[in-house]
UniProtKB/Swiss-Prot annotation:
Heme binds at C357. This is Cytochrome P450 55A3. Its EC number is 1.14.-.-. The keyword Ion transport does not apply.
Length: 408
């Protein structure tokens, strides 16, 4: 499905640009009101259906007539890089049932409620240790909160789950920063990807020689050795877990700080009463949809959705970012309110349905501990430049912050 010359005048290009540094594209509100399911043109001239209402987005996420397999004809890719990546061997996030759940269940035990609860003391220790280092080094000059805190927190925790030796943390964090912070070239990012894959392959080999009870060790022992998966699968799954949520988590920590600076009365409430933190985290993940371009599908057969006929082979992009600002589900959706009372399952920051983010509980635990500890340790933390001068990610990409200079 491609746009013709006449169509391009009326069919908008997607991804849309954010309305401002931190606000979702204005087009979403207009489409929710007037055309909840409409066509958009992608980078290569192909067309896809864009779904913007909460109810329809949830339907897309759970309809088995729609496929997550990126190799299917018509699957909507948003960039040339995405199109190239679609040729790689898939992991569970790009699989349909039953293969999806077969592979996902191999790593799920590491992200259960019990496992995350057991990790909380380690997360707390990691967060507090990084903040203590910041305090010890002082802030005569502004300190980049991303480099010194927001990036290492989620990195160190996922490395520990995977089983990365502590002495390699700095090297891996450096490679991860190159591939994810948007300031490196495409070539540098690709080279960093290769370095990470090579490193993980070496780790898989080590576990074959010396079994250990970490995530890579269990993948090797329970799946690779019995022949359920190949070595390349083990490497790709480890890579997915290493990088998938990392940039998103870094951004959510930084965005949480900025959002509190924009809402000083809520910041004061949060400092006075840490029991408000879980509600703050839920609202943060609704208000700023950290991963907003991942809910893509292709129709396996002709089907009807919201009164529109979707043909087999046509792509669908379900905007969880738009759904998180749906007036029918969240009154005054453009207002940040940490007292907002809603079912956490209605917040779509982590997706919806069988493909909902496997690490949601871990991510929320990390964010809760970060915001319980950050202002308790640095009560006078402030951004050292005007908020409208903060360097953000490009406006057609996921909302995020590149650098966040702070003092305290």
């Amino acid at each position: 499905m491609h746009a013709t010359e006449d169509e391009t005048t009326t069919i908008p290009r997607f991804p849309f640009q954010r309305a401002s540094a931190f606000e979702p594209p204005a087009e979403f509100a207009r489409l929710r009101a007037n055309e909840p399911i409409s066509q958009v043109e992608l980078f290569d001239g192909s067309l896809a259906w864009l779904v913007v209402k909460h109810e329809d987005v949830c339907r897309v996420a759970t309809d088995e007539r729609l496929s997550k397999e990126r190799t299917r004809l018509g699957f909507p890719e948003l960039s040339a890089g995405g199109k190239a990546a679609a040729k790689n061997k898939p992991t569970f996030v790009d699989m349909d049932a039953p293969a999806h759940m077969n592979q996902r269940s191999m790593v799920e035990p590491f992200f259960t409620e019990d496992h995350v609860e057991n990790l909380r003391p380690y997360i707390k220790e990691t967060v507090q240790g990084l903040l203590n280092d910041m305090v010890a080094n002082g802030c005569e000059e502004p300190v980049d909160l991303i480099e010194k805190f927001a990036l290492p927190v989620p990195s160190y925790i996922i490395y520990t789950i995977l089983g990365v030796p502590f002495e390699d943390l700095e090297y891996l964090t450096e490679q991860n920063a190159i591939r994810s912070n948007g300031s490196g070239t495409a070539q540098e990012a690709a080279a960093a990807n290769q370095q990470l894959l090579k490193y993980l392959a070496k780790l898989v080999d080590q576990r074959l020689q010396e079994p250990k009870d970490d995530l890579i060790g269990r993948l090797v022992d329970q799946q690779l050795v019995p022949g359920h998966i190949e070595k390349s699968d083990a490497v790709q799954i480890a890579f997915l877990l290493l990088v998938a949520g990392n940039a998103t988590m870094v951004n959510m920590i930084a965005l949480g700080v900025v959002t509190l600076m924009q809402n000083p009365s809520q910041l004061e409430e949060l400092k006075a009463d840490p029991t408000l933190v879980p509600g703050f985290v839920e609202e943060l993940c609704r208000y700023h949809t950290g991963s907003s371009m991942a809910m893509k599908r292709v129709a396996k057969e002709d089907m009807e959705l919201g009164g529109k006929l979707i043909r087999a082979g046509e792509g669908i992009i379900a905007s969880n970012q738009s759904a998180n600002r749906d007036e029918d589900v969240f009154p005054n959706p453009d207002v940040f309110d940490m007292h907002r009372d809603f079912d956490s399952r209605d917040g779509l920051g982590f997706g919806f349905g069988p493909h909902r983010c496997i690490a949601e509980l871990l991510a929320k635990a990390e964010l809760e501990i970060v915001f319980e500890t950050l202002f308790a340790t640095l009560p006078d933390l402030r951004v050292s430049i005007p908020l409208d001068e903060i360097e953000c990610t490009p406006r057609h990409k996921d909302v995020g912050i590149v650098r966040l200079p702070v003092k305290w």
